[in-house]
Design a protein with these regions (language model features):
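Active-site phosphate/pyrophosphate-handling residues
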Residues: 9, 41, 96-100
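A generic structural signal for short hydrophobic patches within well-formed alpha-helices
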Residues: 11-12, 39-42, 72, 116-117
Length: 132
């Protein structure tokens, strides 16, 4: 299975069978990668320090794609491409960085968020929309 970066929108809907089944299969296949901006979004939901630590531990088993200056520069470049189309205010900074990291790693990006479809129109990178 190809390495996949899983957006926050997928993690939040993981209890829906149309999302959870493919996500579970990818996790079992050791094909899921995490990027810091997505992890930070997920950790915002922690109820306190203990919950925060538990969530971090759950995601610690996933592959990591570190962010670097090239990924940051690519995110800015993609945002510029979106601006030329009038869509630069849609995708968040997290979306742009996650997409750039996935692209750099040659990973597919899984989402439940239409912003990634806009990003992929600029980048041509592989994405997969899960859920309904």
């Amino acid at each position: 299975m190809t390495l996949v970066v899983v957006d926050t929108s997928v993690w939040q809907r993981r209890l829906q069978p149309s999302v959870g089944v493919p996500l579970g299969d990818a996790i079992e296949s050791d094909a899921v990668a995490m990027v810091d901006p997505i992890e930070l979004e997920l950790l915002r939901s922690a109820w306190g320090s203990k919950d925060h630590d538990q969530i971090r531990e759950e995601y610690s088993v996933l592959h990591r794609i570190p962010l670097d200056a090239e990924i940051g520069a690519r995110a800015v470049e993609v945002q510029s491409g979106l601006a030329r189309r009038g869509y630069h205010r849609g995708p968040s900074v997290t979306d742009l960085l996650a997409a750039a990291a996935a692209e750099a790693a040659g990973a597919e990006l899984w989402h439940c968020d239409r912003h990634f479809e806009l990003i992929a129109e600029v980048t041509g990178q592989p994405i997969r929309r899960l859920g309904t």
